[in-house]
Curated annotation (Swiss-Prot):
Signal peptide: none annotated. Mg(2+) 2 binds at residues 315, 319. This is Terpene synthase 3. Belongs to the terpene synthase family. Tpsa subfamily. It catalyses: (2E,6E)-farnesyl diphosphate = germacrene D + diphosphate; (2E,6E)-farnesyl diphosphate = alpha-copaene + diphosphate. InterPro entries: Isoprenoid_synthase_dom_sf, Terpene_cyclase-like_1_C, Terpene_cyclase_plant_C1, Terpene_synth_N, Terpene_synth_N_sf, Terpene_synthase-like, Terpene_synthase_metal-bd, Terpenoid_cyclase/PrenylTrfase. Mostly expressed in stems amd leaves, and, to a lower extent, in roots and fruits. Disulfide bonds: none annotated. Binds 3 Mg(2+) or Mn(2+) ions per subunit. The gene is TPS3. It is an enzyme of class 4 (lyase). Its EC number is 4.2.3.133, 4.2.3.-. Sesquiterpene synthase involved in the biosynthesis of volatile compounds that contribute to the characteristic flavors of black pepper. Mediates the conversion of (2E,6E)-farnesyl diphosphate (FPP) into alpha-copaene and germacrene D. PANTHER family: ALPHA-HUMULENE_(-)-(E)-BETA-CARYOPHYLLENE SYNTHASE, OS04G0344100 PROTEIN-RELATED.
Amino acid sequence: MGFSFVTNAAIAAHMPPSKQEIIRRDAKFHPTIWGDHFIQYLDTPIDPPQKVVERMEELKKQVRAMLRDTNLDISLIDWIQRTGIAYHFEEQIAETLKHVYEASTLTTDSSKYLEHFDLRHIALRFRLSRQQGYHASTDVFKRFMDEGDKFKQSIANDIEGMLSLYEASFMSVKGEAILDEALAFTGKNLEATLPNLTGSLAQQVECALEIPLRRCTDLVKARRSISCYENKNGRNEVVLELAKLDFNLLQAVHQRELALLTSWWNELGASTNLPFTRNRVVELYFWVLEVLSKPEHARAREIMVKSIIMASILDDVYDVYGTLEELQLFTSALERWDLQALEQLPNTIKTAYSIVLRVFKEYEDLLKPHEVYRVGFARKALIPYMNAYFLEAKWFYSHHHPSFEEYMDNALVSCGYPFLFLVSLVGLDEIATKDVFEWAIKRPNIVVAASMICRNRDDIVGHKEEQERGDVPSGVECYTKDHGCTEEEACMALQAMVDDAWKDINCELLHDTSMPKAILMRAVGLARIISILYQYRDGYSDSTHETKAHVTQVLVQPIPL
């Protein structure tokens, strides 16, 4: 497990200095808060201690036996998924949830069968079925509603039932009024009840109200859930111990990958040669890790994290550093994609271009001969991404204020997610076929939805700082101007689009899709990380608050055993 970074000779040539001084913008990004912290893990053994491996195998054997039990309480599956160890038992869980769905939906006496379950179990069965890709019906909740299609006030006293229904409501697709009502009802009542709760239930409600399970990334969810489960009465000690050991084992792997990545970044020289760019190597690794979190994703992580570091550099070149003339030359050079273009570029732009060429060369070095065709798709996805950046630069220099529609048409590309989704597939195994890349390059619906979530959340929490820096109008300003509304109303409208985009993602993940779930889940991961990084602020540009806390929990502090 781990990365195998390659190094190439730097391409260095210098243009004579311009006779006319150019005034550059300064975004005043804070320096890295991690520095070379993770270098210390370079000497971490690649293989975990044999005693840990043997203990984990014994625990996994016990969990498999539990999953074969016909009297299994599906709450155990829920906690196995929450605590991050479900990837060890995917086949057994899939088989169990298939039976759960069929018993709840396809049997002739399914309604009578479900009468034996309370609200907590009904909502849990619904959520787990939808998570598995089954189109479970919302009719199962009707017996908890009154004649006015409102939830009965009596269930407000059932905190576990309300929490389960609240989490289930985030599995909705468009047009499901019952789940919309469920979210409004449970959200209001859980917020009112939270101050009176204690213990594990209080932890669960607090975490759910902050980030529901559907929108939370795998490793943040696992860390939080292990803490909640440890305080829960009736917990399964085997599951708890396995979850702790697994989390710490993976954390050690990720720390070593970050050590290699930090060395690669230092050798790249971007902090010295491109000092205006953000050094967010650790934060970007965290971003990618929550998209590609499984151990077998090591190669895919390496390719994607190099890509997102490159994308961040390019973002700052277009958004902060470059003049319109320089950016025209740069964009044209990227479109031509040849070394000769380097000679026509100013020194700093040349450095950025050499990084792009290097990263794409490293793609090829990491891929097998029959996989190298994937690099062409990545290059094809990069060009419209850079053209979208260049259009925003033209807006900036011409003082153009786009309409909201014009802004969004470009922003759904300039957010970078169509490119990042495609490169998240480049390092995957045989599941990423040529047909998958042909599909991904066309910006499918699930990628558009993830892009909407990324763009709108970034604009909602970061537009004020962007305007203070003198950036082009964000979606908030464009919407406000088009609709003659307040900033608060514009933010509410953009958040409604985010919620609708999540419903689109849910719809795409139901079983009638033609793409493997393992491919689609990369888009889900991209959407989820936005819930973490852009919840209260732009947690990428300013990573000193919540982002630092998340990184610390996931990548620095092991779980006490």
